Structure formats: structure tokens, C-alpha cells
């Protein structure tokens, strides 16, 4: 039995789930009656995890956003992890949505502070885009997992490498 147990907190997105949500959103776009006759498009830039939505109507642009968000929720991706990058208008209305796939330093500090303030017997350290949590008892690690899930973060939190 190991004397210390640990796990990593990260915000990594499953790229395949992102792609699946994109495919499902495109399929729904093709079959929606209220979008017939209106030029609407959904594209995904997989490298940057950016959804590019465009429509000839501003109201339908919000419908496209709702479709994408609902498909992401069904695929298990936290909707708070999606940020609106830019909204452009002209002949076509465009909207770019970015999926957050890393813990930035501000959120890492917030998570680390919450863990330290909990008075649990754990050690946490920020390692780039991940936070390593170490404890002698697995119960303490599970309490930290529960604590982090309850924090109001705009990230898709995942726990990895529980040892």
C-alpha cells in the first residue's frame, strides 16, 4: 500500500467529444425546420477548440449557440467552459466560441487557495496547467474532489492519475 496518494486536477477537454458535439450540432442544424431557408453554418477549428457560427439572422445566431451548448452538455462538457470570443455583424452575423481547455493561473490560484482554506490534510501544488494534490488518505483526496467540483469555475474540471 502506498504511503501517499495523489491526483491531478486539469481542465483538459476530450477533443473527440468536442468533435462529436460538433457533428451532432451540424446534424441538428440540417434537420431544424425553423432554420430552413436561412443561411446558417457551424465550423470547428479542432486545434484551437473554436466553434465558428455564422447566420444571416442575428436571432438565429443565438439559436445556433444554444444548439452547440446543448450538444456539449450532452457530451459531458461543462457549458461554463465555453467563452464567447467575438461577435461580428454585417451581411452575415458571426460568433466565435472558444472551449477552455487549460487552467489559467488565476483559476489555479483560486483552486489552490480553496484547498488550503479547507484545512484538509493535503498538499497541493500548481504544475503548469495542472494542480497536483497529495494526501496520506484517499478520503481526503475525495473530499478535495468534492470541494473543487462545488467551486464556481468556468472550466471543464477533470481529475486524473489517482494513485
From Swiss-Prot:
Keywords, alphabetical: Nucleotide-binding
Gene Ontology terms: cellular component: cytosol
Record-linked CDD domains: YajQ_like
One term of GO molecular function: nucleotide binding
Family of the protein in this entry: Belongs to the YajQ family.
Functional description taken from the UniProt entry: Nucleotide-binding protein.
Name under which the protein is recorded: Nucleotide-binding protein CJE0423
Source organism of this protein record: Campylobacter jejuni (strain RM1221)
